[in-house]
Amino acid sequence: MTTQKQHQQQHHLQSGQEKNKALTLIICVCGLYGTFLTWSILQERINTKPYGDNNEYFKAPIIINLIQALFASIIGFIYNYVTTTTTSTKTTTKTKTKTNSNPFSIFFTNGKQNCNVLKFMILISITSSIASPIGYKSLKHLDYLAYLLAKSCKLIPVMIVHFIFYQTKFPNYKYLVAGLVTLGVILFTMAHVTTKTKINDGNTLLGLTYLIGSMILDGLTNSTQDQLFKLPLENKLTSGKLMSLLNLFIFIWTSLYTIIFHKYEIDYTINFINNYPELLIDIIGFAICGAIGQVFIFIILEKFDSIILITATVTRKMLSMILSVILFGHHLSWEQWVGVGLVFGGIGLEAFIKFKQQSQQKMKIKSKVA
């Protein structure tokens, strides 16, 4: 009888844990959709749509990046404090010394690796600081949907950087995915080359140059970030520490660059906001949504399989494109729809193969245990 009761209690406990996990996943996915769909709409609104009766366009992308980094850093510090405090209450006093809630401690408590941590953090923040404004510059010459489509696949820039700097070889399916995505983006962009607006001058070649440069910098950022996480650190670099410190560095570099070389953008932004106060609401909303969205990404990565994050991210980007078409009146030709299909088909193929690989690994582990 005692054994049967123990089995029942264990079953109820597992059932409760599964329900809590499912509820957490639903909240995180809904949060991811809600924040990043809003973020995407505001991004297009700020960068490509006119304000006021005079139809003035906001042309200070560095300021957008500056404000986004500030809010992401603040929310990152809050997220880091909450997660480290929660973790500390569940650990012993011995472990508490290693779970330091001060994110700056990673620069002083890792012995010989202190310099490497600082070096990688500076490099990541610089490449990230440059990538975003260059990407926004491409919007002067390309449609927002082309920008969104190209940014939907992070595999290509990562492959380019690894090939150039590390001579890395990839599985054959990744070359197929990269080919499908590249073909899709080119088809989508070139099929709409004749269309231009006041904000889009139709100079597709220049726009693609900016976009490719931004994507390569994204790849360098992601690859260097991978190297940072591989460092043997005693005081581990958590997602909260990375988010808070990285965005703080981006804010510092962008502030210095703006003050030294683009001080006029500060005055321009202040005057623009005085004339069109709704811009300030849009930028703050954009920054907050992006920062909170990052937190949901980290929670999903920490508590669930990466395949769940990939699936949620891909479907979110598809919804972003659909919302952009509906809300901002984009008209896509059949060639562009084929391009969209190729891009998301390639991303979907990558997700499917990763899912199969994970399933096979789990089956092997189970067979070894049995």
UniProtKB/Swiss-Prot annotation:
Record flagged with keyword Transport: yes
Keywords from the UniProt entry: Endoplasmic reticulum, Membrane, Sugar transport, Transmembrane, Transmembrane helix, Transport
A biological process (GO) annotation for this entry? UDP-glucose transmembrane transport into endoplasmic reticulum
Q: Which domain of life is it from?
A: Eukaryota
Q: Which InterPro entries match?
A: SCL35B1-4/HUT1 (IPR013657)
Where would you find this protein in the cell? Endoplasmic reticulum membrane
Residue ranges crossing the lipid bilayer per the database entry: 22-42, 62-82, 115-135, 145-165, 175-195, 204-224, 242-262, 280-300, 307-327, 333-353
| GO molecular-function term, one example from the UniProt record | UDP-galactose transmembrane transporter activity
Q: How does this protein lie in the membrane?
A: Multi-pass membrane protein
Gene Ontology CC entries for this record: endoplasmic reticulum membrane; Golgi membrane
Q: Which SUPFAM superfamilies match?
A: Multidrug resistance efflux transporter EmrE
Asked if Endoplasmic reticulum is a keyword of the record, the answer is yes
* Name of a matching Pfam family: UAA
The job of this chain, per UniProt, is described as: May be involved in specific transport of UDP-Gal from the cytosol to the Golgi lumen. Involved in the maintenance of optimal conditions for the folding of secretory pathway proteins in the endoplasmic reticulum.
Q: Which family does it belong to?
A: Belongs to the nucleotide-sugar transporter family. SLC35B subfamily.
**Protein name per the record:** UDP-galactose transporter homolog 1
Native source organism of the sequence: Candida albicans (strain SC5314 / ATCC MYA-2876) (Yeast)
Taxonomic lineage is: Eukaryota, Fungi, Dikarya, Ascomycota, Saccharomycotina
